[in-house]
């Protein structure tokens, strides 16, 4: 809230002060009242509004003004109706009275000025003065909230540039300018006002490395935008002429919210009195605009797809052809990373997660680059980041990175309501160890801190360390569906698979085998059902998935009716450290690519019953009644044999939510 300095008056000599239009300035009546005074009256020029907070006046003075008692509860404020045309052109007279003293007067000469710092605090996309009752120095959530929003300028408008736009202190062009938030300083003063007064724009020193402010000046791009605040400068003294002026600023974020940064940045304009060169400058007035840096937001499977990413490598030509046909059916753009750029690293899902940032005036897709840094490490920087496509990462030391730091272990639910609490942007899901041990793996705390600090998609920790790779996308997915929730949660289910195989054996299909047409050992339904070792392994897997099932029901507000069990078997193998972990026994159907109503599902190569794969038939019977279309894609040799599936090998850029993140209440 804008604040003016307290004005003190004294009978000995006139007082001179500045009053900012629209701001109630405190006036100290009692501090220098003559000894013996018990009451006072006050008169002022027509352009000055005097407000006395007290009980009823004691009586009328001889001048016709009300007399007020001088008691400790007295509060007097002044407001100017308009800016002064010259210095000291408004006057306030205070008369003091006492039972045994004659009337004594104190004079106050006022200069009214208009001074305001405005930004888009109403979130309409345009900078304008805050409406009455809105304190622009605060930031509030919700549909009735207020406060300005700032984007991290993390895209790269110049394709030839080696870094993000915020990494330099220049405005490249008007497109670069559109990534920034406008802010305007409006002033109206007497012509010689700034001979004795100074305006200073400032940011707290602790926040100076989180923001950069450009001042618009006359001239051609880019020289007409001068850096006035940023990592090297926490304050800027404005040299202004008197009269009426408007000064435009453009503000860019330099850092996302994180464990050590809540995302709030106050920018303050201060008016200083420098009239006496022998004294330090005195603070006369301050106005502050509070900005919040927009969070990075993930998009769930229920959001419309816009672009699919995949790698080309020596073993996936047939897969690419199938994927191209599938994405064409879903009317979705397909971008293929060439082999020379991925260095045989086919795990596109693990390398990055594509989300977005948003302010009222601009929405920007932003890729979050994982710290795994294998063959695809340059792809997010060199091929995804660009004009109107931002980039963010959180670096880790190589020795600190585990498989759970890859982004197949980072998912987000559709919007949910949990025990009355709304999550209109869904909740982030990350995999972790169920309990700590010398061999346990977790997503690094630096990544978890970043995700939690965004505030709008409160993370949920799931148990995934039981898996060979350890990612949540190995046992769950979400698909759009009709109904109240608007989606279904798909969970891998050994129990459902055993039940199905048992029924088929009872019907006389025990000799039907998996992996028909593949160079794999023949495995019949009866072989699988008779293996106690495999049963024990899948009972363990089922217990792990059941644990997550209860967590998901509790943290996402789901019921059993919101969950579909996808038949799936696992087996236990040793990982690189020799620890027993689970991996899919046949291609993991829940690890699917969801493009609207079109599902690209790993072809399971299940037993053929009456000319059709019984696993495919079962999944279709579960999902097609929801209005979904199932396409089974052969990824056996290109992905499944390397511990991944269709979802692991692809990535999707999706349409941002229509819901505005600032309308929610975290």
Swiss-Prot record:
Keywords: Calcium, Chromatin regulator, Citrullination, Cytoplasm, Hydrolase, Immunity, Innate immunity, Metal-binding, Nucleus, Transcription, Transcription regulation. One of its GO terms (molecular function) is identical protein binding. It catalyses: L-arginyl-[protein] + H2O = L-citrullyl-[protein] + NH4(+). Ca(2+) 2 binds at residues 155, 179. The keyword Membrane does not apply. One of its GO terms (cellular component) is protein-containing complex. Ca(2+) 3 binds at residues 165, 168. The active site is at residues 350, 471, 473, 648. Ca(2+) 4 binds at residues 349, 353, 407, 410-411. Its cofactor is Ca(2+). It is found in: Cytoplasm; Nucleus; Cytoplasmic granule. Ca(2+) 5 binds at residues 351, 369-370. Binds 5 Ca(2+) ions per subunit. Autocitrullination at Arg-372 and Arg-374 inactivates the enzyme. GO terms for biological process: chromatin organization; chromatin remodeling; innate immune response; nucleosome assembly; post-translational protein modification; stem cell population maintenance. Substrate binds at residue 374. Ca(2+) 1 binds at residues 153, 155, 165, 176, 179. The modification Citrulline is found at residues 212, 218, 372, 374, 383. The keyword Magnesium does not apply. Its EC number is 3.5.3.15. CDD domains: PAD_N. PANTHER family: PEPTIDYLARGININE DEIMINASE (PTHR10837), PROTEIN-ARGININE DEIMINASE TYPE-4 (PTHR10837:SF3). Belongs to the protein arginine deiminase family. This is Protein-arginine deiminase type-4.
């Amino acid at each position: 809230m804008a604040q003016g300095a307290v004005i003190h008056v004294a009978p000995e000599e006139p007082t001179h002060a500045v009053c900012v239009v629209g701001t109630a300035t405190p006036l100290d009546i009692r501090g220098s009242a003559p000894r013996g005074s018990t009451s006072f009256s006050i008169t002022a020029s027509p352009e000055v509004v005097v407000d006395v907070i007290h009980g009823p006046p004691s009586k009328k003075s001889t001048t016709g003004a009300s007399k007020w008692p001088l008691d400790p509860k007295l509060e007097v404020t002044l407001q100017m109706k308009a800016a002064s045309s010259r210095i000291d052109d408004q006057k306030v007279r205070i008369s003091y009275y006492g039972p045994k003293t004659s009337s004594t007067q104190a004079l106050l000469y006022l200069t009214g000025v208009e001074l305001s710092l405005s930004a888009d605090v109403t979130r309409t996309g345009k900078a304008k003065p805050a409406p009455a009752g809105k304190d622009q120095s605060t930031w509030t959530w919700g549909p009735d909230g207020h406060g300005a929003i700032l984007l991290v300028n993390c895209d790269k408008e110049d394709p030839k540039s080696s870094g993000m736009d915020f990494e330099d202190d220049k405005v490249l062009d008007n497109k670069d300018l559109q990534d920034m938030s406008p802010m305007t300083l409006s002033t109206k003063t007497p012509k010689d006002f700034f001979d004795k007064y100074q305006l200073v724009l400032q940011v707290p020193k602790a926040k100076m490395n989180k923001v950069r402010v450009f001042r618009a000046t006359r001239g051609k791009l880019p020289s007409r935008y001068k850096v006035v605040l940023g990592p090297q400068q926490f304050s800027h003294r404005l040299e202004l002429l008197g009269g009426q002026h408007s000064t435009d600023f453009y503000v860019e974020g330099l850092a996302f919210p994180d464990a050590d940064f809540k995302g709030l940045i106050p920018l303050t304009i201060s008016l200083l009195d420098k009239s006496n060169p022998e004294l330090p400058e005195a603070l006369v007035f301050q106005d502050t605009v509070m900005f919040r840096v927009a969070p990075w937001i993930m998009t769930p499977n229920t959001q419309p797809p816009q672009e699919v990413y995949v790698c080309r490598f020596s073993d996936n030509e047939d897969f690419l052809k199938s994927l191209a046909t599938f994405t064409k059916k879903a009317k979705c753009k397909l971008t293929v990373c060439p082999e020379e750029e991925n260095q045989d690293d086919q795990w596109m899902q693990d390398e990055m997660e594509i989300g977005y940032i948003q302010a009222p005036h601009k929405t920007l897709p932003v890729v979050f680059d994982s710290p795994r840094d294998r063959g695809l490490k340059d792809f997010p920087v060199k091929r995804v980041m660009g004009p109107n496509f931002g980039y963010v990462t959180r670096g880790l030391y190589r020795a600190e990175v585990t498989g759970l730091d890859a982004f197949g272990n980072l998912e987000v639910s559709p919007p949910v309501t949990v025990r009355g609490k709304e999550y209109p942007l869904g909740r982030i899901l990350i995999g972790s160890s169920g309990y700590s041990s010398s061999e346990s793996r977790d997503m690094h705390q630096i990544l978890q801190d970043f995700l939690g600090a965004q505030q709008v998609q409160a993370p949920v920790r799931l148990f995934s360390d039981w898996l060979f790779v350890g990612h949540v996308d190995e046992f769950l997915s979400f698909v759009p569906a009709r109904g109240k929730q608007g989606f279904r949660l798909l969970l891998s289910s050994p129990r459902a698979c055993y039940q199905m195989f048992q029924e088929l054996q009872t019907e006389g299909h025990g000799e039907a085998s998996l992996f028909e047409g593949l160079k794999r050992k023949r495995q019949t339904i009866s072989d699988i059902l008779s293996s106690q070792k495999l049963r024990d392994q899948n009972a363990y897997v089922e217990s792990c998935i059941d644990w997550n099932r209860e967590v998901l029901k509790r943290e996402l507000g789901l019921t059993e009716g919101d969950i579909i069990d996808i038949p799936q078997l696992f087996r236990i193998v040793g990982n690189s450290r020799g620890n027993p972990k689970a991996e899919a026994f046949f291609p993991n159907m829940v690890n699917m690519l969801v493009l609207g109503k079109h599902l690209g599902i790993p072809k399971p190569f299940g037993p053929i019953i009456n000319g059709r794969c019984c696993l495919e038939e079962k999944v279709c019977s579960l999902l097609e009644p929801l209005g979904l279309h199932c396409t089974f894609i052969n990824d056996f040799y290109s992905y499944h044999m390397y511990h991944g599936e269709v979802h692991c090998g692809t990535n999707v850029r999706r349409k941002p939510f229509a819901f505005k993140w600032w309308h929610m209440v975290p």
